[in-house]
């Protein structure tokens, strides 16, 4: 059994295995505190994220389970990679990933970026998104602080705590306001992978300008300043608004014409302007995809169709509609952690014994119960439609 060491970080107890030393706080991620550390096993620097109260409520448990499953499934050069995971004696969950030196937010705070760096960073973001979207996943919270960069300018997208299934029925208030797509504000219900493209367009503009493109003070101001630059949304987009209150608000705004982005970004390359215009489109159906953006002339110096992979299989979202108690989510997480560490058999080829065996069996039973409930629900819906 692993030895655990307790350390206080920002008044928070970090309880980690003795494998990791030299803890230093890095910052807060989505729903967790992040520290840098030294992995004595590999002699590499790593980031350790403590998930706050993973078993506090069913919602928090499900969110943690979702992030764990995503980190296990999504394996790509431009996505943060999970190297270890463990549950402490206090039942806190810790994700261990590679450590990158900084993030895009901090980089933009220090100095303007030169063209070749903007191109390379944008290329890597889109390369990662092409893979993520092909797996049937929407990140939902892309922003400069969720984009990590090392000294070689290698870039990795992190914080999949809010990521969701590609779906036409999603709940609304998720991404950081400055980078939030208009369809999230307009409909609060229906959106898909295109929200990540909008966020990327905002990040692209921020790399060019050195400051946020749409720094809204609140929800209303955010949408208003978007229309000041991009003009009023077209009628076919307005007709998709589900909320009566939102529809009334949009109708009260003065009619505005689109301002050419070239007049705002006077020093930008025309090809950069063209790509940004294809990203920052009100109608998500007309927004450029990640794969299409990679093939845009602006990214020609880096574009290589043979080295821009898609996911081998789509992510399994079968758990996503499950309404399960904390204890069930807990045993399912234990099972995922055992699977990550390949704790299926012992050194003699025998099934796991004791607690591991019990947890594994409980998790399998919980999953089977959930799948059976979903099957009954689908059967009932089919009968009602007949």
Swiss-Prot record:
Dually phosphorylated on Thr-171 and Tyr-173, which activates the enzyme. One of its GO terms (cellular component) is cytoplasm. It catalyses: L-seryl-[protein] + ATP = O-phospho-L-seryl-[protein] + ADP + H(+); L-threonyl-[protein] + ATP = O-phospho-L-threonyl-[protein] + ADP + H(+). It is an enzyme of class 2 (transferase). The keyword Amino-acid biosynthesis does not apply. Its cofactor is Mg(2+). The active site is at 141 (proton acceptor). The modification Phosphotyrosine is found at residue 173. Keywords: Activator, ATP-binding, Cytoplasm, Kinase, Nucleotide-binding, Nucleus, Phosphoprotein, Serine/threonine-protein kinase, Transcription, Transcription regulation, Transferase. Pfam families: Pkinase. Residues 355-372 have a biased composition (Low complexity). Activated by tyrosine and threonine phosphorylation. Its main location: cytoplasm. It is found in: Cytoplasm; Nucleus. Belongs to the protein kinase superfamily. Ser/Thr protein kinase family. MAP kinase subfamily. HOG1 sub-subfamily. This is Mitogen-activated protein kinase HOG1. The gene is HOG1.
